[in-house]
Amino acid sequence: MNIHEYQAKEILRKYGVPTSTGLVVTKTEKINETIDKLNTEVYVVKAQIHAGGRGKAGGVKVVKSKEEAKKVAHDMFGINLVTHQTEPQGQKVNCLYIESGCDILKEYYFSIVFDRSASCITFIASTEGGVDIEEVAAKTPAKIIKFSVDPATGLQDFHMRGIAYELGFKDNQAKQMKEIVKSVYNAFVETDAAQIEINPLIVQTDGNLLALDAKITFDDNGLFKHPNITAMRDHDEEDPLETRAANAGLSYVKMGGNIGCMVNGAGLAMATMDIIKLYGASPANFLDVGGGADRERVKEALKIILSDKEVQGILVNIFGGIMRCDIIAEGIIAAAKDIGIKVPLVVRLAGTNVEKGEEILSNSGLDIIPAHDLADAANKIVAAIR
């Protein structure tokens, strides 16, 4: 789950991280009133969307008067902001964060993530802040600093000292950086975050460090422990189909292709998407119905897939372990009769009650294309949409 910048800063401040502060606007009629509350020489108007690259796309504006700030805020509110991380149509700006400007001496990059390849928490930092870290890693990898934290020992003083040293901080700034590392680590662990990113972390002209921008992504599996964080969820920023799927207990991610996929198990789902690409088409989605899906969940899964207007065909690939193939077959038929599947549908079943499932499908009277293995299924669905 993602949250907005202003929410991320609120959390970080609770853990002792110094951040820039501002005021939130969620209604156009509140813009002027909100800006009037700020007394500063420089105003920074920031679009609050769940995507990076806002600055380059015009979603962050720096102005030097209240009147300019009001005009910029009114112009920005409600637009569709297009960045390299949004869909082509962009993301609608329903919220603004208006801050006082800062005097910046130097910008740094600092983040903490769970490194799945190393199975541990890893700090990533760089003296090149305020830009895309992927670009820095590609062009000047030597400027990327990494420190991994052994899960058996947790954060140690040498991690904090090492990061401060590698970034070139000394004396009081090194002390400040050590405290920031400790605070960010505690926030990461205690909130079950997947990533905390501060970009840029700045040195002000007075020598103090400040988080000028912040992003936090949370592990959805840990949200049940944090109702206060779950309450920060902004459904307007999420794909409505993904929200609908989550409410139905389904794992769904829209991919932008033309073949809808319904699979049980994340590994099998990824293999299914790969083989669709291999045969010359593109998956429209990742959809894992889970191991204990019933008839109604299967029906809802197909409805969600068909809600995507880009879908030209559907591939159902089920291995019946915990799940029974006859239940899947009944769900497919119920969905087909209820909503009317007008695109080619290929079904590959294997495992528990597979013969019964195949019999149910063949006797349904519906135009369902059976497949005997994964390659056969991919070949048939790609051929069917051409």
Swiss-Prot record:
One GO molecular function term of this record is: magnesium ion binding
Cellular compartments per GO CC = cytosol; succinate-CoA ligase complex
Entry binding sites for substrate: N264, G321, I322, M323
Gene3D superfamilies to which the protein is assigned, alphabetical: ATP-grasp fold, A domain, ATP-grasp fold, B domain, Succinyl-CoA synthetase domains
For this protein, the record's InterPro entries field holds: ATP-grasp (IPR011761), ATP-grasp_succ-CoA_synth-type (IPR013650), ATP_grasp_subdomain_1 (IPR013815), Succ-CoA_synthase_bsu_CS (IPR017866), SUCC_ACL_C (IPR005811), Succ_CoA_ligase-like_bsu (IPR005809), Succinyl-CoA_synth-like (IPR016102)
Q: Which residues cross the membrane?
A: none
Entry keyword annotation includes ATP-binding = yes
Q: Where is the signal peptide?
A: none
Pathway in which this enzyme or protein is active: Carbohydrate metabolism; tricarboxylic acid cycle; succinate from succinyl-CoA (ligase route): step 1/1
Q: Which PROSITE patterns match?
A: ATP_GRASP, SUCCINYL_COA_LIG_3
Which Enzyme Commission number(s) are on file for it? 6.2.1.5
Domain ATP-grasp positions: 9-244
| Record note on quaternary structure | Heterotetramer of two alpha and two beta subunits.
Q: Which family does it belong to?
A: Belongs to the succinate/malate CoA ligase beta subunit family.
Family annotation (HAMAP family):
Succ_CoA_beta
Function recorded in the entry: Succinyl-CoA synthetase functions in the citric acid cycle (TCA), coupling the hydrolysis of succinyl-CoA to the synthesis of either ATP or GTP and thus represents the only step of substrate-level phosphorylation in the TCA. The beta subunit provides nucleotide specificity of the enzyme and binds the substrate succinate, while the binding sites for coenzyme A and phosphate are found in the alpha subunit.
Q: What is this protein called?
A: Succinate--CoA ligase [ADP-forming] subunit beta
- Which species expresses this protein natively? Rickettsia akari (strain Hartford)
Q: Which gene is annotated as encoding this protein in its UniProt record? A: sucC
